[in-house]
């Protein structure tokens, strides 16, 4: 459901390829020899230390609660752009996204910049000043409790946070 809803949404880009985007995250872990399980939104998460929820656009009943409990109990949740935007009927969730995961991530998204296919931006990590390339979508984040780990390197949002960490519960 998340896949079709995301690919059929009318914005911020028509170039959304859910499987391609998820594969980017899978490959990053695979390159580091980190085993990856692909599980359903309804799966029990208790046996995991880390959960990556790429493009968790559609938040069905119980999903946000499971992720919140997972983090409260000490788990690490990695989220991405296009998370927590729509409910189970593909209607936008009011109150800024990541919707019901806003407190877990400690931030909200003010706006999303859709980059042209050939366009990139930079991520500059705070600690070591390493620079990484980013493309496709760039969220303008407004931090509530989260702390900045990396910032955008160019465009009108240069210096704004793009990689963050938030302590929530024991996670």
Across the structure, where does each feature detected by a protein language model lie?
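Carbohydrate-binding surfaces of carbohydrate-active enzymes
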Residues: 1-171
């Amino acid at each position: 459901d998340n896949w079709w809803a995301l690919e059929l949404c009318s914005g911020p880009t028509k170039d959304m390829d859910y499987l391609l985007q998820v594969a980017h995250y899978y490959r990053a872990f695979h390159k580091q020899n980190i085993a990856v399980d692909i599980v359903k939104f309804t799966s029990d998460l208790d046996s995991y230390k880390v959960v990556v929820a790429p493009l968790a656009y559609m938040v069905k009943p119980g999903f946000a609660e499971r992720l919140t409990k997972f983090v409260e109990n000490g788990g690490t949740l990695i989220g991405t752009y296009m998370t927590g935007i729509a409910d189970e009927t593909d209607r936008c969730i009011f109150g800024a996204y990541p919707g019901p995961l806003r407190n877990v991530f400690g931030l909200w998204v003010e706006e999303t910049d859709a980059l042209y296919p050939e366009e990139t931006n930079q991520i500059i990590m705070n600690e070591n000043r390493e620079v990484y390339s980013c493309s496709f979508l760039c969220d303008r984040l407004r931090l509530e409790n989260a702390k900045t780990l990396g910032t955008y390197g160019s465009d009108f949002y240069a210096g704004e946070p793009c990689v963050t960490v938030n302590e929530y519960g024991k996670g």
